[in-house]
From Swiss-Prot:
PROSITE patterns: RIBOSOMAL_L1 (PS01199). This is Large ribosomal subunit protein uL1. It comes from Pseudarthrobacter chlorophenolicus (strain ATCC 700700 / DSM 12829 / CIP 107037 / JCM 12360 / KCTC 9906 / NCIMB 13794 / A6) (Arthrobacter chlorophenolicus). HAMAP family: Ribosomal_uL1_B. One of its GO terms (molecular function) is tRNA binding. The lineage of its organism: Bacteria, Bacillati, Actinomycetota, Actinomycetes, Micrococcales. CDD domains: Ribosomal_L1. Belongs to the universal ribosomal protein uL1 family. It comes from the Bacteria. Part of the 50S ribosomal subunit.
Length: 235
């Protein structure tokens, strides 16, 4: 295991490893214990009580964070004709069809989200082995397979995030930057948590959210009490 930096060790010393913090308290502590000198990203991880190998226990969705992520997403749109022009006008970073499909088939994935018009999904679907593992495959359930490319691009640029449980039953997503006000971070966390709870599969038995953790990019993990869903602005 790599040796932790002194800054990391100092940050970890401020955290009670035996305690599960309220959301506001956790994000405040994450801000205070950021060991990096740059404006680090704050991420959340949930361990879910589901078996993602079973189709009826897959958790996948989207959430519009009320305060965005602090990151401007690079959006790729598979479209032609008027839809391509609309995507460009909406601010998409990459727009095309066969040219982009060929480039991605060669291994290029230098973008954060992908949108496709329904008529092109027959071709885009062949990119599953490249886009699927990176959670970049357009999907009707997340609003990224749609004729309304303008709305899709605006939503993603405005702070919409996609999430999907991985093979280890974990969900990961960004809730903002260290520079964000703690209340805004807590409100973003609450919005994401609410959507994850709404998507609980009926086949999931027992405790649904088994563990919740907040951490900065290179900072220590901070346990969050998943039973606290309201934004409490007092520790």
């Amino acid at each position: 295991m790599a040796k932790r930096s002194k800054a990391y060790e100092a940050a970890a010393a401020k955290i009670d490893a035996e305690k599960s913090y309220a959301p506001f308290e956790a994000v405040t502590l994450a801000k205070d214990t950021n060991p990096s000198k740059f404006d680090a990203t704050i991420e959340v991880a949930f361990r879910l009580g589901v078996d993602p190998r079973k189709a009826d226990q897959m958790v996948r969705g989207t959430v519009n964070l009320p305060h965005g992520t602090g990151k401007t997403a690079r959006v790729l749109v598979f479209a032609t004709g008027d839809k391509a022009e609309a995507a460009i006008a909406a601010g998409a970073d990459f727009v095309g069809s066969d040219d982009l499909i060929e480039k991605i088939a060669g291994g290029w994935t230098d973008f954060d989200a992908a949108v496709a018009t329904p008529d092109l999904m027959g071709k885009v679907g062949r990119l599953g082995k490249v886009l699927g593992p990176r959670n970049l495959m357009p999907n009707p359930k997340t609003g990224t397979v749609t004729p309304d490319v303008t709305k899709a691009v605006n939503d993603i640029k405005g702070g919409k995030i996609d999430f999907r449980v991985d093979k280890h039953s974990n969900l990961h997503f960004i809730i903002g930057k260290v520079s964000f006000d703690a209340v805004k971070l807590a409100e973003n966390y609450a919005a994401a948590l609410e959507e994850v709870l709404r998507l609980k599969p009926s086949a999931s038995k027992g405790r649904y959210i088994q563990k919740a953790t907040v951490a900065t990019t290179f900072g220590p993990g901070i346990s969050v009490d998943p039973n606290v869903t309201k934004v409490l602005t007092e520790a």
